[in-house]
């Protein structure tokens, strides 16, 4: 009889966990509080190790349809604009690590994973069903949903976000979120609206006192993702 993992949360981590379990020969039963799956946020960078795993799951074509492949990483001074360091990406990553270094919008990555999970017969997706309580972990792992449904499995994966109700139950109060002392401001701009001189197919990092900023293309170069991180209270 196949083992079954119970997954709390249907975001990027939850969908990836379900696919990983499925490809490892497990059944995966995923529970998501929202009735409609969606992913908010902006861009994310995926190193070659992640891309190799997505390729192993048969997602190379889906990834290519939505991701960008930056050609280099450039670090600049936020004060002078001077180039401090650079490193090749693009084909250099493929030759060295066997896969590209890509940048992608989080919503696009979630769509790729969700679509792949829906095609797997051993992944059971349950929207509108929040995992509310962990009942036991002795003989089997037992959970109760917010609708008072009791479900048993062989393992539990918590992927229900930074405000998880179950993580403190499993790991204790020290696992609760803490203020980092940094604030992140994010934006997405159509590449066509950016002055030509600022458009690039690069990951650019601007380094300055008590701050740094990063921008890179997403959505096959049609959008630029920007994040500025500064020190400050929450």
Protein language model annotation of sequence segments:
Residues 2, 25, 41, 70, ...:
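Short coil/loop residues immediately preceding or within conserved phosphate-binding loops
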Residues 2-5, 22, 49-170, 175-190, ...:
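Conserved N-terminal helical subregion
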Residues 3-30:
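N-terminal Rossmann-like FAD-binding beta1-loop-alpha1 element of flavoenzymes
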Residues 6, 29, 124, 214, ...:
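A structural signal for isolated positions on well-ordered beta-strands in alpha/beta enzyme cores
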Residues 13, 36, 163:
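Conserved Rossmann-like nucleotide-cofactor binding loop
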Residues 35-55:
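Conserved N-terminal glycine-rich FAD pyrophosphate-binding loop of Rossmann-like flavoproteins
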Residues 167-170, 197, 227:
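A short secondary-structure junction signal
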Residues 200-234:
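Active-site substrate-recognition segment that forms the wall
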């Amino acid at each position: 009889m196949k083992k079954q993992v119970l997954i709390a949360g249907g975001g990027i981590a939850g969908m990836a966990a379900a696919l990983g379990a499925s490809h490892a020969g497990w059944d995966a039963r995923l529970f998501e509080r929202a009735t409609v799956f969606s992913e908010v946020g902006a861009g994310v960078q995926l190193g070659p190790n992640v891309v190799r795993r997505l390729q192993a799951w048969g997602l190379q074509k889906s990834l290519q349809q939505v991701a960008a492949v930056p050609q280099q990483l450039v670090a600049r001074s936020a004060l002078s604009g001077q180039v401090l360091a650079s490193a090749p990406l693009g084909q250099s990553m493929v030759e060295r690590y066997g896969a590209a270094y890509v940048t992608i919008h989080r919503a696009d990555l979630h769509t790729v994973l969700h679509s792949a999970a829906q095609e797997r017969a051993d992944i059971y997706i349950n929207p509108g069903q929040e995992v509310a309580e962990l009942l036991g972990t002795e003989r089997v792992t037992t959970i109760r949903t917010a609708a008072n449904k009791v479900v048993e499995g062989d393992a539990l994966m918590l992927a229900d976000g930074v405000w998880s109700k179950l993580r403190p139950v499993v790991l204790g109060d020290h696992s609760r979120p803490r203020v980092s002392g940094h604030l992140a401001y994010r934006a997405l701009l159509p590449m066509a609206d950016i002055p030509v001189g600022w458009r690039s197919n690069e990951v650019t990092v601007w380094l300055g006192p008590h701050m740094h900023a990063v921008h890179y293309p997403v959505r096959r170069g049609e959008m630029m993702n920007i994040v500025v991180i500064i020190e400050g209270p929450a």
